[in-house]
Amino acid sequence: MKKIVLALTFVLVGSFMLAGCSKDEILNHYNNIVQSAGSIELTGKSSLQGEKEKGIDDYTGTYTADYANFSGTEYLFGGTSIKREAGKDLSIDCTLEITEGTAKVFWISGSDEAVTLIEVTGTYSDTITLPDGGNYIGIECENFTGNIELNIE
């Protein structure tokens, strides 16, 4: 019974808060909530193997790292924005050097399979267009020794 009363209270409070808001204001509030939730998926700065400089939002910035026998996945950039203020296009420049093990830089969108951007020593440069919803760029490593320089604008 308490759960029902609590749920109804939230619905009523939410209704009063949104009363008088335009459709665009409601969508902007919703987008902000969704974006905040999407930031949780990113690997925390203290858990990253390298140094990350944030750009204008969670989708952009630079990341450089030297790895030594690292196994794991780092979600570096991205989020769950419905309407990204800076537009849907991201310019990606990446230099990957693999000394040992394997590493692949990937882009995952929604529930789609991850798209490998680069997985061999070399460079990658392209512009991708993000669909609405969750989009993340990361690196997946297995006993990886090497380095990465990643710049996203």
Give the label of every model feature segment:
Residues 140-153:
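Edge beta-strands of jelly-roll/beta-sandwich modules across compartments, strongly enriched
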Residues 69-90, 127-132:
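Extracellular and analogous surface-interaction loops
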Residues 17-20:
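C-terminal motif of bacterial Sec signal peptides marking the signal peptidase cleavage site
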Residues 88-98, 139:
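A short beta-strand element within beta-rich, extracytoplasmic domains
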Residues 61, 131-135:
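A glycine-anchored, Pro-Gly-centered beta-turn/N-cap motif
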Residues 1-5:
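Positively charged n-region of N-terminal signal peptides that target proteins for export
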Residues 24-81, 115:
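Transition segment at domain starts
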Residues 100-116, 152-153:
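Short, surface-exposed beta-strand/strand-loop-strand elements in extracellular ectodomains
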